[in-house]
Structure formats: structure tokens, C-alpha cells
Amino acid sequence: MTNNEKVINNKKSTDSSKLFRYQAKFVAGAMNINQIPNFLLPEIAFIGKSNVGKSSLINTICNNKNLAKVSNIPGRTGQINFFNLADKLIIVDLPGYGFANVPISVKEQWEVLISYYLRNSNNLRLVNLLIDSRRGIKENDKKVAELLLKNKRSFQIIFTKFDKVTDCKNLTDEAQNFLTTLHYSCNVMYVSSRSKEGARELKASLAKCIIKPQRSKGR
């Protein structure tokens, strides 16, 4: 039994295999708040530090390596990107945070954009907070988690690049201690875009979002 299977109690979802069998497509990019669309469909968002592997993970779960642009240069995703999956789900790729070599004015613009989206989206069901398995949870990640709770957004923690670490026990302990300080409970998952480990479990958790709304369990 893998760590992810323990997290979701071994529940398999045929809905996820059916949903992610469809081809996702890019439908909009928003560089400012006036460009944020309303598709009237459930949305699930991905957020994390620059170069955490957001685009690669989105490509992995959508089975399309060219869907979200992948770059080794941190800070390349400078807008909110929206992808439509079978007219059933909108996948939202939020700009990365924590990259130092970006002008302060640009950082502030991204912060305004992200904060506005998290505060105002009526369709957002779940946020996936991505953490690099090699780095662990950093101060910027904690601030984002607090922002999510402040806006009453449900989230789950996704440790990316899991193929590059040998043991998840320290990560699990770190995540649980972190969640305890937040007085929040959520899934903690481990995924590798390279080996595909954890991808099926992640898809299952996302597919649930089109069935029923996700409510914050904190505070």
C-alpha cells in the first residue's frame, strides 16, 4: 500500500478515470483582475513556489505534456491560466510565488491577482498547495495556507517531485505539525510527475470536486 493510498483509505474512483480520459484545453489567461473569466463550472486551483512543478503536474494528470508550458526558469508563469476539462471542470494554474529575481512591482501585481481570485471566485472548490518534497514547507508556503484559510478556501497539500526523496516520514510529520498549528485537517499527498506515482489518487480527489462542494474544515 502506498502512502497516498493510506491518505485516501484506498478508495478508487471510476469517475476520475472517466473524467481525465478527456482532452483538457487552454481556454483563458488572466494578467489582471478584469481578465478573470467566469465559466460557471467547478474550479480546482494549483498554487506553489516558483519551479515547484505546477505545470508538469497539471500536464501529468491531464495526460498532455504540452498543455501547460513547462520552464526551468522560476517565475515564468506570470498569469492565471485556465484549462477546461470536458466542460466539467476548470483547472486553474496560479502564478508561482517566492521567486526573488522578479521586480517588486511584478510581485505585487501577482499578489493582487492571486488574492483577488482566491477572495472572489464563486466556483473554486479546492486549492492544491504544492510543496517541493526536497525543500519541505517554507515560510512562504505557510503564508499562502493562512491566506487560503482567511478566505475560507479548502486545500490539500501535495508534495511534488516525490521520486527525488527516499522517505516521506519526515514530510508527513512536518505536514501534520504544520496543519496542527493551523487547526486544519486535509489530505496530504505525494506525487511524482516523472514516475506518475500518486497521480491516480490525486485525480480521484479532484474528481470529487465536481460531485459536491469542498468546504474548509479549519477555524
From Swiss-Prot:
The keyword Repeat does not apply. Residues 40-212 form the EngB-type G domain. GO terms for biological process: division septum assembly. It comes from the Bacteria. Its cofactor is Mg(2+). Keywords: Cell cycle, Cell division, GTP-binding, Magnesium, Metal-binding, Nucleotide-binding, Septation. Gene3D superfamilies: P-loop containing nucleotide triphosphate hydrolases. GTP binds at residues 48-55, 75-79, 93-96, 160-163, 191-193. Belongs to the TRAFAC class TrmE-Era-EngA-EngB-Septin-like GTPase superfamily. EngB GTPase family. NCBIfam families: GTPase_YsxC. This is Probable GTP-binding protein EngB. It comes from Rickettsia canadensis (strain McKiel). The gene is engB.
